Swiss-Prot record:
Coiled-coil stretches noted in the UniProt entry, renumbered to this chain: none
GO molecular function per UniProt: ATP binding; protein serine kinase activity; protein serine/threonine kinase activity
Enzyme Commission number, as recorded: 2.7.11.1
Protein name per the record: Serine/threonine-protein kinase mos
Residues binding ATP: 8-16, 29
Residues of the Protein kinase domain: 2-200
Family, similarity comment: Belongs to the protein kinase superfamily. Ser/Thr protein kinase family.
InterPro entries, per database record: Kinase-like_dom_sf, Prot_kinase_dom, Protein_kinase_ATP_BS, Ser/Thr_kinase_AS, Ser/Thr_Kinases-Pseudokinases
Organism: Vultur gryphus
Catalytic activity: L-seryl-[protein] + ATP = O-phospho-L-seryl-[protein] + ADP + H(+); L-threonyl-[protein] + ATP = O-phospho-L-threonyl-[protein] + ADP + H(+)
Keyword terms of this UniProt record: ATP-binding, Kinase, Nucleotide-binding, Serine/threonine-protein kinase, Transferase
Amino acid sequence: QLCLLQPLGSGGFGSVYKATYHGATVAVKQVKKSSKNRLASRQSFWAELNVARLQHNNVVRVVAASTCAPASQNSLGTIIMEYVGNITLHHVIYGTGDAWRQGEDDEGGCGRKALSMEETVCYSCDIMTGLAFLHSQDIVHLDLKPANIFITEQGVCKIGDFGCSQKLEEGLSQSPHVCQQGGTYTHRAPELLKGERVTA
């Protein structure tokens, strides 16, 4: 039912692969067991499932998840998500990754076109729409950065990588430290940096 095709990338808590699941192309994240910080690894896996039942055009959809994995994989579990490609907003802004946005009107002198005002507005609207939806579901993404915004072939931005997210119970959080082990320090929410509780 699940067949891994090729690696797409890896991060602090696991690896992501392009795969097929029941014949459909998907992305598969295998959350690795961390010998140094098992609690953080577990938190990352369960945080990814905060969006498991949500469907929104600007949020990467979780298709399925399992905690069953062969011992040889050293994995806490597997998360199967919709495949949205491997281009992120980081690639678009900084011109990294695959040959992206190659063009003749190279404004920066580095072999890529600058984002147009129209693209900038469209991407911003997609991200804000996705965030507003997540907040309406009491979910806070605690590692929102260009590398976690995926851009589809149709040019739609989707928020992904929820390994450092939090579901606010009854609109409040009593644990500001939930994801301080993970996430990107330079993109961390101000309230986390101050040691305050997470807000939406």
